[in-house]
Amino acid sequence: MEFKRCSGILMPISSLPGGYGIGSMGKPAHDFVDFLAKAGQTIWQILPVGPTGYADSPYQSCSAFAGNPYFIDLDMLAADGLLTKKDYAAINWGGDAAHVDYGTLYEKRFAVLRKAYANFLKKRPVPGYETPYPDDWYRFQFLSSDWLPDYCLYMAIKEANGMVDWQQWPRALRVREPEALAEFKAEHAGEIEFWAFLQYEFDRQWRALHAYAKEKGVAIMGDIPIYVAADSADAWAGRELFETDAEGKPRRVAGCPPDYFAADGQLWGNPLYDWDYHRRTGYAWWILRIRHALSIYDILRIDHFRGFDTYWAIPAGETTARNGRWEQGPRMELFRALHNALGSLPIVAEDLGEMFDSVRELLAESGFPGMKVLQFAFTGEDSVDLPHNYPRNCVAYPGTHDNNTLTGWFAKELTAAQRKQAVDYFALTKQEGTVRGMLRGVLASTAALAIIPMADWLEETAAARMNTPGQAQGNWQWRADAKKLTPALAAEIRVLTERYFRAAK
């Protein structure tokens, strides 16, 4: 795909302002769509919206299909008669409005959501004899039948076992013995349905938000990681999809080889795909996954695109990534299968880092736009990440969720020589401001699409950084201050957007 010249803003759902501990799909999200429209933006990029677990990373979700219950808007549940304000308004969701307190959310949010479910049970319609799904509750379950039952069962079993990794469950449940699963379903039917209810509410609220964004001329760019988490419904219920043994334990796991930045490489621990199985089944699971993603997003960014060309496979049990080896991925065969099944693929490829020539060839053959990041540019050489070198078919960023804010980066991460190079390159002045000058450079580039993180428009310090790779705790927490998302800021963004011919018509 190729974009017409345009721009957008990266703003995670979790970072939206609001009163209940984390951003949501209700008024905070709708207000942000209004802000984008006033600012002349046509794309809202978000991070993955799956349920989060250990370390709160949206890239390590327990499902490739489910939505995060934390994003369900409580006021919308109240408007539907499933809650009252007193059920949640007085709860302390964390003492710092600028950061998500995931521990507090975990302790308190589900109790409120269970109240909503209890009220839902009182209102739930009984299906008629003539049709299996006379309303949207049954319709949602029917349309989600490829993944919802396994996800809800996984979550119910996980909760019954103290939320431990599924590899630590009783063996009969771990290996999915039919009798054990049937017995659990019979004894925990209500708990299983609770998890279905959460996905139903997520779906209702998300589709309302998506429709509102379309009405305002704003497309939503979603994001999915290439791999699923080891502790996920996908790995538990679909072990044939991965390189696993009879017990479902990975034989090899994902990561990155040693490099200049990490002498031992990066050991991610995700189960690797059994690409031979996917090939034999016509990539059916991938078609299902991408079809689902494109049903909720207008554009899809896929993380770690290089893994479709070659991927680093590390024997399970290794403590570092040193002893891995490169293996061949599915390359264009996968994308041809996706195209044949789904038609045009509005995909953006995350192609950052060192790349083999074969990865560049795959990107070119796919036609997907890659990414360029300003913060990688100032090496003292004529870097491909300097704006004058951007190809048209790419997405330009000052930084991604894995980078510091521009303010933090310029102040702390550049040498004196690099800082001088940046000042000279952009002709930065005190009058314009350092950050505004660099954003000007990204917007002025020839890249068809420019995406600016909201934290950079707000000129936030390093405290607003979303993620520091390699840091286990303290990530994914930043939240924007609603008072800073002003009409004046929207007007300023629109002026710059129009100046560089990126504004919505």
Mark where each language-model region is.
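Conserved, well-ordered alpha-helix/loop/beta-strand core segments that scaffold catalytic motifs
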Residues: 195-228
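Catalytic domains of carbohydrate-active enzymes, especially glycoside hydrolases
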Residues: 2, 27-52, 295-297, 442
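Alpha-amylase-like alpha-glycosidases and glucanotransferases acting on alpha-linked glucans and related
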Residues: 1-5, 12, 18, 56-199, ...
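N-terminal catalytic cores of NTP/NDP-binding nucleotidyl/phosphoryl-transfer enzymes
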Residues: 8, 12-31
